[in-house]
A protein has these predicted regions:
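Nucleic-acid substrate recognition interfaces
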Residues: 1-365
């Protein structure tokens, strides 16, 4: 199996210049390939990866585009493969039509592949094609590296995301089952009666973020001080993102390791974000990313993920007798008593138990 491990790297000035040169060349080739495929489509021609790769070879022969020879050649080819994958995802209706890349995008990355051991970690350094040895902050040991994505973030930092082979550790509970009901106040409640609070990282950083953004708005446009302040704002956002990702990684790993079967609600998160009263809170808790982590980690450990339909009334149904109480549509009701069997329910715990029951029912159907 494969997974990505992200480490921070510290290139020197010359290496930074090369990284940005390669980023620019990859963006140029990607956009050139996209324009070629778009024009071909309009003229009824079928343009694929092989045609765009031949285009790259021809461009390198022209003196006007001699700068392409200085970049990482593997990275240029990978940008065309990424473009091809974008079209595959578009035609299979998994993504929208590929867009042109802008140099004004503050987040930039390129991918390069390990060939003949030209990517490896040696002590406190990582060897990368054409970059040589770059200082790396390595927090764990890695085996053979398949490929690397070099990232430059809006906060001005550089990272290497290593794709490596790994063997997942055995689960602590091979037969466990659990239902998960996500929320805003509590990040999720489970069918065992546990509740995990929403850490609200963005809300906790909002005062500092507003202060830094206010300072940014006062800086003169295109000035050096404005760029320094922009980086300060980006670092606040980056800290919130890192805190949230760490929380999601730990919660998803714990659930997958401790349970064989996980039942979740198949929420239309994009549709829910259209509600302007809840959009900020929903985006902040990152349910979609949490579900995505559960899915790919379940693939590692051989777990089963069952998605219960959105329209299933998990909160309104009594988990003891099955009575449906339409009065519970009111989101303000957190504790309720079943009129039929008189069981007292916590709204979220009851919903998670019903999600588990429905998911197991779908599994056996």
């Amino acid at each position: 199996m494969q997974k990505g491990i992200k480490f921070r790297i510290y290139p020197n000035r010359e290496q930074k210049n090369f990284i940005h040169q390669t980023l620019g060349c990859c963006r140029f080739i990607y956009n050139r390939g996209l324009a070629m495929r778009k024009e071909g489509y309009e003229n009824g021609e079928k343009i694929g990866y092989s045609q765009t790769s031949a285009m790259l070879t021809e461009l390198k022969k022209q003196e006007e585009f001699a700068f392409l020879k200085a970049a990482d050649s593997i990275a240029l080819q990978q940008s065309l493969r990424d473009l091809d994958r974008g079209f595959v995802n578009f035609f299979e209706k998994r993504a929208s039509y590929p867009n042109f890349k802008s140099k004004h995008n503050r987040f930039q990355s390129y991918r390069t592949v390990n060939q003949k051991d030209n990517i490896r970690i040696v002590g406190r350094y990582i060897k990368l094609p054409k970059l040589g040895f770059v200082k790396i902050r390595q927090s764990m040991e890695v085996e053979k590296i398949n490929h690397v994505i070099i990232e430059h973030t809006p906060a001005g930092k550089y990272f290497a995301v290593l794709n490596v082979d790994f063997e997942p550790e055995p689960r602590s509970n091979a037969g466990g089952t659990i239902g998960i009901d996500v929320g805003i106040k509590a990040f999720y409640s489970d069918s065992n009666g546990n509740m995990v609070s929403n850490p609200r990282y963005l809300e906790r950083s909002m005062r500092k973020l507003i202060r830094e953004q206010r300072r940014l708005s006062r800086k003169q446009k295109d000035s050096h001080n404005r760029e320094k302040q922009r980086i300060r704002v980006a670092r606040v956002y980056e800290k919130v993102t890192n805190q949230r990702n760490d929380f999601l990684q730990k919660q998803s790993t714990m659930l997958v390791r401790e349970n064989q079967t996980i039942c979740i609600e198949d929420l239309n998160v994009k549709g829910m974000i259209r509600n302007h009263k809840l959009s900020k809170s929903i985006a902040s808790v990152s349910w979609a990313k949490f579900f995505e982590m559960l899915e790919y980690k379940a693939g590692w450990y051989g777990n089963e993920i069952h998605r219960v339909p959105t329209m299933y009334p998990s909160s309104q149904t009594c988990s003891c007798c099955g009575y449906r109480n339409p009065r519970i549509k009111n989101l303000g009701i957190r504790i309720w008593e079943c009129p039929k069997c008189h069981a007292v329910h916590d709204r979220d715990t009851n919903a998670s138990i019903n999600i588990l029951k429905k998911g197991l029912q779908m599994q056996s159907a």
